[in-house]
Structure formats: C-alpha cells, structure tokens
C-alpha cells in the first residue's frame, strides 16, 4: 500500500498540493491541488519529466482527477514574502477544487493550510497525489511564462521561465527590470532604480502599497551599501 492509500484509508478524500515557480525572479507562484482516485502511470516529480511527458500526463490528470489551481502574483510575493505568497496560492488552489478534501499532502515542510494535512519533504517523489499536483502547477506556470514572452519578446521567458539563469540575468541588465519581476528579490532589487520604480507607479503598473514597500527596500539597501563602502575604506560612518 502506497503513502497516498494509507492517508486515504484514514482520512477519506485526500488532496496532493504542490507549487511551481517559488524560486523564480519573475512571474507568479502557481499552486495546484489534485484529488485523484484512478491510477495514472508515469506520475513523478514534474522536474524529472520532459515537457512533452508533462503535457501528456496533464491531459490524463485533467480527465481523471479533480484539479484546483491557485496563483499568487509578483505583487503579492513582494508584499507578503514568497513563503506566505506560496501558502496563499496553495489555499486558493484548494478553494478551487470541486471536491473538498478532508486532508492534504503538501510538498515541503512547515506549511499549514486551510485544510488539515501534513508536509512531505520531496513529497513529489513519494506521493502520486503530490506528483500530479506538481505536473499541473509546472505546466500551467510554464504556459503563463510563455505568454509573458509574447508580451516582452526581449526576455526569453518561454525558455528560462523566470528563473535566475545566466541568460535571464543578462536580459535584465540589458533591457531593465519589468513590473512582472519580483522587485523585492535580489538581484532584481540591485538592478532597480528609484526612477524606474516611480515610473511603474505613475503608469499604474504597480500599486501604491507595492511602490512604498520596494522604495523602503531600496532605501535600506543603499544604506547597507553605504556602510560597507565606508567600512571597506576605513572611513567613519557619519
């Protein structure tokens, strides 16, 4: 008996929950919740599957399972931090399930959601439910990032998906920061200027709350850099 069956035997309806995009510099974090009763062959951690295999499995998952998807935007990530934004996306995924689970299996650790559950480290390799959720979240987010590439063709979002690859970092240095970047993340914050941030706000591309949050982070960062430079040159701070 697998781990999913053990929890189903005890709790009844069990959902697997996972996210995609937590470590990216751009785009949302996407979560999926899956309730699966029928066996699907080949489900594994989405990162270990080819894109073509993920797409094929997604079709079967959508046909055989109840699926909920939740998104937390770059703004929410900047305002609430990535851990809390991930929880927000996961709870939204659970809310969007047509079948309401009594227990959830969550990939990771230390994550408490709106439904009772337990966390499994590397859960996408241990649980078919979490593995299915990882596939749904990954494919859905990849499709979103490909749409961003069409909006911003100077960025290869269809390839690096917003992760901190060498290619992506070079694109930021060459083309500048976008509103869909996570402005609170280094090295995005390092490459962001006060003037560009203000331009985003004045054009209505970011909210006032996000503007003030990032402006404060920029100010704190400049203070740290100033102190380091003065210390390195053996100069008094004031």
Curated annotation (Swiss-Prot):
PROSITE patterns: RNASE_H_2. Residues 12-197 form the RNase H type-2 domain. Endonuclease that specifically degrades the RNA of RNA-DNA hybrids. GO terms for cellular component: cytoplasm; ribonuclease H2 complex. Its cofactor is Mn(2+); Mg(2+). It catalyses: Endonucleolytic cleavage to 5'-phosphomonoester. The gene is rnhB. Its main location: cytoplasm. This is Ribonuclease HII. Manganese or magnesium. Binds 1 divalent metal ion per monomer in the absence of substrate. May bind a second metal ion after substrate binding. Belongs to the RNase HII family. Its EC number is 3.1.26.4. Pfam families: RNase_HII. It is found in: Cytoplasm. InterPro entries: RNase_HII, RNase_HII/HIII, RNase_HII/HIII_dom, RNaseH-like_sf, RNaseH_sf. It is an enzyme of class 3 (hydrolase). Signal peptide: none annotated. GO terms for biological process: DNA replication, removal of RNA primer; mismatch repair. Keywords: Cytoplasm, Endonuclease, Hydrolase, Manganese, Metal-binding, Nuclease. Disulfide bonds: none annotated. Transmembrane segments: none annotated. A divalent metal cation binds at residues 18-19, 107. GO terms for molecular function: manganese ion binding; RNA binding; RNA-DNA hybrid ribonuclease activity.
